[in-house]
UniProtKB/Swiss-Prot annotation:
Keyword Magnesium attached: yes
Claim: Transferase is one of the keywords in the record: yes
EC top class, as a word: transferase
Source organism of this protein record: Shewanella halifaxensis (strain HAW-EB4)
Family stated for the protein in its record: Belongs to the transketolase family. DXPS subfamily.
Lineage of the organism: Bacteria, Pseudomonadati, Pseudomonadota, Gammaproteobacteria, Alteromonadales
Its EC number(s): 2.2.1.7
HAMAP family according to UniProt: DXP_synth
Catalytic activity: D-glyceraldehyde 3-phosphate + pyruvate + H(+) = 1-deoxy-D-xylulose 5-phosphate + CO2
Protein name: 1-deoxy-D-xylulose-5-phosphate synthase
Length: 621
């Protein structure tokens, strides 16, 4: 499916940055309007991240117009905002395939395009990568420029300031564009600031500034006075003191939707030496009224008709596991004011909106700072509170040292509600929850649970809440639950005990998590025994012994990496018990799982009922 490009006459002339740079500057505002219109139609047909890209249209046009990409390096942070970049870098005709199996990648991806200089998906990485590229450019005397684009939300991450501190020390030429779309840093935007930014980035101002530094080098007292005077003058209209203290020359804030102002300011900044930061103000969802009014709700969207100004009504379905968690948290908080909900900037995705509204004093958004969120929970546990850290599997990776050092080592009762475990789908390898069972299982003092349905999920969350001898984790997938009838009464499960779900012959399937339904279907065809193991750690030793003693073959099934996962734990236990037995491990292979619809990926990897049955039949043949 492609669009009639004749509707976008200027965009039709800019399929690549080289073509874009041939256009007169006077047509750039029209190009931005057409690019926004194309993005609107494209995402409407394909689904995907939406509001962020609408806010970076003018910025993207200006960057590729001023900088000689791909020779000059452009590094995007996270990548939600990079759809306009993909459209302008030769992928326009394939944008309708974005996030689909075999289609355009949802984030900047090195394997996909030479214009994607660094593969991303998690936040806060851009400045570190760009700094290294700037150092490399200087070592090679390549004459190339390096630009990192980062949003104000990502600025809450510690890695960002680690990189900026290092950049200020190394003093290599690089530009950081701070895309501020939440008004969280400054409200000083307008013609005065646009004009001031162009003056401060201009050759005359910077020449005087650098010359004065040299003249005053031998007069430290006067030099310090001049420095403070400049800071106060800039501070009257710009909030750049923090960045200046880190060694950056700060310019802005300017209107990020004024493409001419962006072009002129960036042209000036190309000629500046040392680390620079350009602060721009943008509006997430710019140009589409519903997204401007609700940028969070329109952050990522299903397929929709832009002309209706509405997202399609959700089809009736079972509650998601995230919603099950959110309701459980509210139920517990009603009874215990010491229950605290902590999330690293994933309130909506983790199902915590209602909790945050009903229990604001018990809710904490730690921002995009996963390391802090984990240790924040540990501190509360020290004081007798019941912290619940709601976090995506892929983002818990970023707080792994804190999980070990600050939580498990001290046996602190922090409950981790781990969302998006297993195959996530369209967001691809940066977001698949493939590794959590493996990296948690090796940590002493951890109790790890994997529910097979939403009722087990509630009971396991309650079990973690009641457990006081160390950290617990309940790991569940993205999307709709199974439709199981929920038991309102919550009862703590005995730690490390599984449940036999079907009695069969010769083959025993040990299931971990929501693959249980597929295992039961496969078991019917194979007349196999099925156990819902429930606990990844500690394993149900007696149940494993019984299954091994009474069956010829054991099969473990999990939506996690086979290496180091629950199946590995079963093998280790059998070895300890001196019970050698053929064991088939079914799970995710030793590779990064690409993007696509979850059901497509599940089928391709043999994790649906038919795939499980076939793998077992092949193993015993």
């Amino acid at each position: 499916m492609s669009f009639d490009i004749s509707q976008f006459p200027v965009l039709a002339q800019a399929n690549t940055p080289d073509e874009l740079r041939q256009l007169p500057q006077a047509v750039l505002p029209q190009l931005a309007d057409e690019l926004r219109g194309f993005l609107l139609k494209s995402v409407g047909k394909s689904s995907g991240h939406f509001a962020s890209g609408l806010g970076t249209v003018e910025l993207t046009v200006a960057l590729h117009y001023v900088y000689n990409t791909p020779f000059d390096r452009l590094v995007w942070d996270v990548g939600h905002q990079a759809y306009p970049h993909k459209i302008l870098t030769g992928r326009r005709e394939k944008m309708h395939t974005i996030r689909q199996k075999g289609g355009v990648h949802p984030f900047p991806w090195r394997e996909e395009s030479e214009y994607d200089t660094f593969s991303v998906g998690h936040s806060g990485t851009s400045i570190s990568a760009a700094l290294a590229m700037a150092v490399a450019a200087e070592k090679e005397q390549a004459g190339r420029k390096v630009v990192a684009v980062i949003g104000d939300g990502a600025m809450t991450g510690g890695m960002v300031f680690e990189a900026m501190n290092h950049a200020g020390d190394l003093h290599n030429d690089m530009l950081v564009v701070l895309n501020d779309n939440e008004m969280s840093i400054s409200e000083n935007v307008g013609a005065l600031n646009n004009h001031l930014a162009q003056l401060m980035s201009g050759r005359f101002y910077t020449t005087i500034r650098e010359s004065s530094k040299k003249v005053l080098q031998g007069m430290p007292v006067i030099k310090e006075m001049a420095k403070r005077t400049e800071e106060h003058l800039k501070g009257m209209v710009v909030p750049g003191t923090l960045f200046e203290e880190l060694g950056f020359n700060y310019i802005g804030p300017i209107d990020g939707h004024d493409v001419d102002a962006l072009v002129e300011t960036m042209r000036n900044m190309r000629n500046l030496s040392g680390p620079q930061i350009l602060h721009i103000m943008t509006k997430k969802g710019r140009g589409y009224e519903p997204a401007e009014k609700d940028p969070i709700g329109w952050h990522a969207v299903p397929k929709f008709d832009p002309s209706t100004f509405e997202k399609p009504a959700a089809k009736p379905c079972d509650p998601t596991f995230s919603e099950v968690f959110g309701k459980w948290l509210c139920d517990i908080a009603e009874k215990d004011e010491k229950v605290l909900g902590i999330t690293p900037a994933m309130r909506e995705g983790s199902g915590m909106v209602e909790f945050s509204q009903r229990f604001p004093k018990q809710y904490f958004d730690a921002a995009i700072a996963e390391q802090h969120a984990v240790t924040f929970g540990a501190g509360f546990a020290c004081e007798g509170y019941k912290p619940v850290v709601a976090i995506y599997s892929t983002f818990l990776q970023r707080g792994y040292d804190q999980l070990i050092h600050d939580v498990a080592l001290q046996r602190l009762p922090v409950l981790f509600a781990i969302d998006r475990g297993g195959i996530v789908g369209a967001d691809g390898p940066t977001h698949q929850g493939a590794f959590d069972l493996s990296f948690m299982r090796i940590v002493p003092n951890m109790v790890i649970m994997a529910p097979s349905d939403e009722n087990e999920c509630r009971q396991m969350l309650y079990t973690g809440y009641c457990y006081n001898d160390g950290p617990t984790a309940v790991r569940y997938p993205r999307g709709s639950a199974t439709g199981a009838k929920q038991v309102e009464t919550m009862t703590a499960m005995p730690i490390g005990k599984g449940l036999l779900k079907r009695q069969g012959q010769k083959i025993a399937i040990l299931n971990f998590g929501t693959t249980l339904a597929s295992c039961l279907v496969a078991a019917e065809a194979l007349d196999a025994t099925v156990a819902d193991m429930r606990f990844v750690k500690p394993l149900d030793v007696e149940l494993v012994k019984e299954l091994a003693a009474n069956h010829d073959v054991l099969v473990t099934v999990e939506e996690n990496a086979i290496m180091g996962g629950a199946g590995s734990g079963v093998l280790e236990l059998l070895q300890t018990l001196k019970m050698p037995k053929p064991v088939l491990l079914i799970g995710l292979p030793d590779e990064f799982i690409k993007h696509g619809a979850p059901e497509e990926i599940t089928s391709e990897l043999g994790l649906d009922a038919a795939g499980i049955q076939k793998q077992i039949e092949d193993f015993i043949a």
